[in-house]
Amino acid sequence: MAVTYEKTFEIEIINELSASVYNRVLNYVLNHELDTKNTRLLEVNLLNQLEVAQEVDLFQQPFEELQAIHEYWRSMNQYSKQILNKEKVA
């Protein structure tokens, strides 16, 4: 599978966004001293889901799939902001 400039650029954007989202949730979990083994906690489940999603080998994906993955991370970015902000307000 050929790697093009556009594909490499898309992968770099996804990597930056996914790291930002994952780190936001991880920092929340650590700062609130949540038990990472307690799968009944929404934040812990979200952290685990994001960790699994980061393990995808992006270089093995076709460009169209990269676009879908990018949209997934955009959605998780919005979702994590909403969830973590609601927790701060409550």
UniProtKB/Swiss-Prot annotation:
> What name has this protein been given in UniProt?
Antitoxin epsilon 1
Self-association and partners:
In the presence of the zeta toxin, forms an inactive PezA(2)PezT(2) heterotetramer.
The UniProt keyword set, sorted, is: Plasmid, Toxin-antitoxin system
Matching entries from Gene3D superfamilies are given as: 1.10.8.130
The record's comment on protein family reads:
Belongs to the epsilon antitoxin family.
Q: What does this protein do?
A: Antitoxin component of a type II toxin-antitoxin (TA) system. Neutralizes the toxic effect of zeta toxin. Part of a postsegregational killing (PSK) system involved in the killing of plasmid-free cells. Continuous synthesis of the epsilon antitoxin is required to counteract the zeta toxin.
> Which InterPro entries does the annotation name?
Antitoxin_epsilon/PezA_dom_sf (IPR035569), Epsilon_PezA_dom (IPR015090)
Q: Which domain of life is it from?
A: Bacteria
Q: Which GO terms describe its molecular function?
A: toxic substance binding
